[in-house]
Regions:
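Charge-dense, helix-prone N-terminal extensions
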Residues: 1-116
Length: 116
């Protein structure tokens, strides 16, 4: 999935999705685009080097996903216990979409409950 299609997919997940470039003050992270729900990130990638998307995931699923899919890699700059990376060059679109929806739901559910 190319960068534009992935961006549109993330924004289509709900009216509560926001996108930001929050790290513009940092030279090496100025191109990192982050997608948020309820003010918390669920997906991000570097626009200048669109090769890995970092997503939230249930800890109990991560090892299974890594074993089943070569495209599952270490997350960029996040805890590998709760986050995974997905190689955009080799990941099938359906897997990327499923894992992105999952990440969105994890964060939305967790922080919606805290807002109530």
């Amino acid at each position: 999935m190319n960068i534009e299609d992935y961006r549109e997919f993330c924004l289509s997940l709900g009216d509560d999705v926001e996108e930001k470039l929050p790290f513009t003050a940092f030279h090496y992270a100025s191109g990192v685009l982050v997608f948020y729900v309820h003010g918390h990130m669920f997906s991000f990638f570097d626009c200048d080097h669109y090769s890995v998307i970092t997503l939230k995931c249930q800890p109990e699923r991560i090892d299974e996903l890594r074993a089943a899919h070569d495209c599952i890699v270490k997350p960029f700059n996040m805890s590998p216990k709760h986050w995974l990376g997905i190689d955009t060059n080799t990941a099938p679109d359906d897997l990327l979409q499923e894992l992105t929806r999952n990440s969105y739901q994890i964060v939305k559910t967790k922080y919606k409950a805290k807002r109530s």
